[in-house]
Amino acid sequence: PNVVQVYEFSNEGEEGHILAMEYVEGCDLGHLMSAAKSTATRIPPWVAAWIIGEAAKGLHYAHEKRDEGGAPLDIVHRDVSPQNVLVGADGVARLVDFGIARASSKNRQATTGENDLKGKLAYMAPEQMRGDELDRRTDLFAMGVIVWEVLCGKRLFKADSEAATLQRI
């Protein structure tokens, strides 16, 4: 369903975690965008639309996921970015890296310390930066940023410093 499948997960304590995931031959959307920029070209709009549409299917799948009892899991990816959209050699785009995703009816911004944000700043929704309650709209904001960047061939909010990036958003 346009999401890279995780087959096995193991917590190895201090050594970290081990994930066995679906192998996707291809590259991430960020790499495709960089390659287009380095050759002074843009990804054709119809190709961009296909990739974004496929990635959006994966996001929708995650957002609609339910538990065994049928209750919504309310999954929020929180790190939707070109680097987390894998474009396979088979032409299918898949969403990857749910490492900081949250599944609960009250999705709060998780922090590991004061002012420690999770996710890539240039793709964060304003409510994510503020530490407000999050829902699927947070991920849709990030997807919108990706759409703009793919079609325009340049970054939307990225600035010279993190503070300047936050100000632009």
Predicted features, each with a name:
Residues 1-169:
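Conserved ATP-binding/catalytic core of the eukaryotic-like protein kinase fold
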